[in-house]
């Protein structure tokens, strides 16, 4: 149990690194350094809210593998660790590459519309797939961006493989609840770790320990639009756009 939760936290760190890397690219491409230097007082709040938005993504991604980890731990079978490892490799490979792709699309959308992904994003799909492919082929640096995406995807797959091949965690003594030599002290320690882990996931999914959960108003950290645009990530903005599209569809019908 302990080592499987540790693997999940390591994979979560990879997601945070991906989102942080995209933020750096966004800042370099769209935010003047003078603007950042002139608003240093808002940086602590900006970074804190950036972490909240990114941790929400991390914790939602954690939900499925966490549930499977607890279910498999209850089975107490020798093959569960092997199955979980294979699942994590496939799951996080798909999720991380999707996050990278959505973040890249969001950067391209911002460069054209000076906004993160919004309701307008879905208009591209109304023209049909061939028109969309033609527009991308003619208006974007497909070769450079495709090569960059391929290289980053290969790097992500390599990191995932390295995480799952880390055997130092497998030697953790008597970590499993199924171990016959689990002492009372170790059981208390493991129970505490599990409770803290669950609290971390729940709070992260909510994005807040205060009265209101994380919401779009938390992106407003200054009176500068570009600094505010640094706060949300592509996944949150896509979710917001999907909600707006659903509301618009209800109004039309």
Q: Which role fits each region the language model picked out?
A:
Residues 22-53, 91-148, 169-170, 206-235:
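Membrane-interfacial interhelical loops
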Residues 231-253:
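Membrane/wall-proximal cationic-aromatic binding patches
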Residues 130-132, 140-171, 175, 183-188:
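A conserved hydrophobic secondary-structure block that centers on an alpha-helix together
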């Amino acid at each position: 149990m302990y080592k499987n939760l540790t693997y999940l936290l390591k994979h979560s760190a990879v997601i945070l690194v991906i989102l942080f890397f995209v933020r750096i690219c966004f800042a370099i491409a769209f935010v003047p350094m003078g603007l950042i230097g002139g608003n240093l007082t808002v940086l602590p709040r900006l970074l804190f809210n950036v972490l909240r938005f990114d941790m929400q993504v991390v914790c939602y991604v954690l939900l499925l593998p966490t549930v499977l980890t607890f279910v498999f731990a209850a089975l107490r079978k020798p093959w569960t660790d092997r199955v979980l490892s294979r699942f994590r490799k496939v799951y996080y490979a798909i999720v991380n590459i999707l996050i990278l792709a959505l973040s890249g699309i969001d950067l391209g959308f911002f460069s054209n519309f000076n906004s993160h992904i919004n309701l307008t994003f879905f208009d591209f799909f109304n023209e049909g797939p061939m028109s969309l492919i033609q527009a991308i082929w003619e208006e974007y640096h497909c070769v450079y961006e495709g090569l960059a995406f391929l290289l980053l995807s290969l790097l992500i797959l390599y990191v995932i493989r390295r995480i799952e091949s880390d055997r130092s965690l497998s030697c953790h003594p008597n970590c499993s609840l199924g171990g016959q030599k689990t002492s009372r002290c170790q059981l208390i320690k493991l129970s505490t770790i599990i409770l803290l882990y669950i609290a971390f996931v729940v709070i992260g999914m909510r994005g807040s320990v205060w009265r209101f959960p994380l919401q779009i108003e938390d992106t407003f950290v200054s009176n500068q639009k570009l600094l505010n645009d640094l706060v949300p990530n592509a996944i949150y903005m896509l979710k917001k756009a999907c909600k707006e599209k659903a509301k618009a569809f209800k109004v039309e019908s």
